[in-house]
């Protein structure tokens, strides 16, 4: 958090959508919204006054175990990072190309998993939602991480794992594999390389007003394909 503090700015807007949370300060950052019926009764600290704060103050929410607050915190961190790296690259293309005949673990449900399954030697998908677990399809509960990740050649971890505090542990389990952290929640900071990531694949929000409006109106997948000219993929390698 402190490494990005030099880019602190007044908060212009905060949106908590059903899929994504956005914070707009100097730049616009995103974080995955993990909401449940239980969080409906747990009020976000400072609600109604978040735009009177700075992005660094909101970034400290990332430490919260109230996961809606944590999403606001991660989005605030991302709003203080100007993404570096190659633009316009889709990390899933890299994963499919490099995953041929490899043992792969994917943490989180990503698009194009059937393509990845076709080229890989073995593919395990770790899923937090118990309703989506299907062992016959290789979709396992997240608790299988200890068993599957250390056996993998390639590991792809959703950047949303930083919101629920599992990212550091997942990177530790992945120390013998080539590891990607990807998705809009991913902080594009080389600090993550110190924790074991080999590639970061996040986004740069080019048009904050449009993206903030879309995520607050139920926007799900945010990508250059369905938010043309408003968001861009960025990839950075160790």
Which residue ranges define each predicted feature?
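Electropositive, gly/pro-rich neighborhoods at or near active sites that engage anionic ligands
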Residues: 1-118, 215, 232-238
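Short, conserved loop/helix-junction motifs that constitute active-site signature segments
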Residues: 99, 116-119, 149-150, 171-176
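Short acidic low-complexity segments
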Residues: 90-95, 138-150
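Residues in the short beta-alpha loop(s) of Rossmann-like NAD(P)-binding domains
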Residues: 110, 129, 185
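A short, gly/pro- and small-residue-rich
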Residues: 123, 165-184
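C-terminal functional extensions of proteins
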Residues: 180-238
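NAD(P)-binding Rossmann-fold cofactor-contacting core
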Residues: 120-135
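Structural motif
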Residues: 105, 154-158, 180
């Amino acid at each position: 958090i402190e490494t990005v503090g030099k880019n602190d700015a007044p908060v212009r807007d905060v949106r908590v959508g059903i899929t994504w949370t956005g914070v707009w300060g100097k730049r616009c950052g995103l974080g995955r919204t993990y909401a449940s019926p239980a969080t409906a009764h747990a009020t976000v600290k400072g609600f109604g006054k978040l735009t009177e704060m700075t992005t660094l103050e909101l970034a400290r929410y990332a430490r919260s175990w109230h996961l809606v607050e944590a999403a606001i915190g991660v989005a605030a961190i991302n709003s203080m990072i100007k993404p570096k790296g190659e633009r316009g690259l889709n990390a899933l293309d890299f994963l499919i190309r490099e995953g041929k005949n490899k043992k792969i673990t994917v943490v989180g449900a990503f698009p194009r998993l059937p393509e990845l399954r076709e080229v890989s030697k073995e593919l395990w998908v770790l899923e937090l939602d118990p309703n989506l677990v299907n062992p016959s399809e290789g979709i396992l509960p997240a608790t299988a991480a200890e068993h599957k990740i250390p056996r993998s050649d390639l590991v792809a971890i959703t950047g949303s794992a930083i919101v629920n505090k599992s990212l550091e542990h997942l990177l530790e389990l992945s120390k013998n594999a080539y590891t990607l952290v990807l998705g809009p929640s991913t902080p594009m900071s080389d600090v993550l390389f110190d924790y074991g990531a080999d590639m970061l694949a996040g986004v740069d929000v080019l048009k904050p007003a449009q993206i903030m409006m879309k995520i607050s109106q139920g926007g799900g997948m945010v990508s250059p394909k369905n938010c043309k000219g408003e968001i861009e993929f960025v990839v950075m390698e160790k």
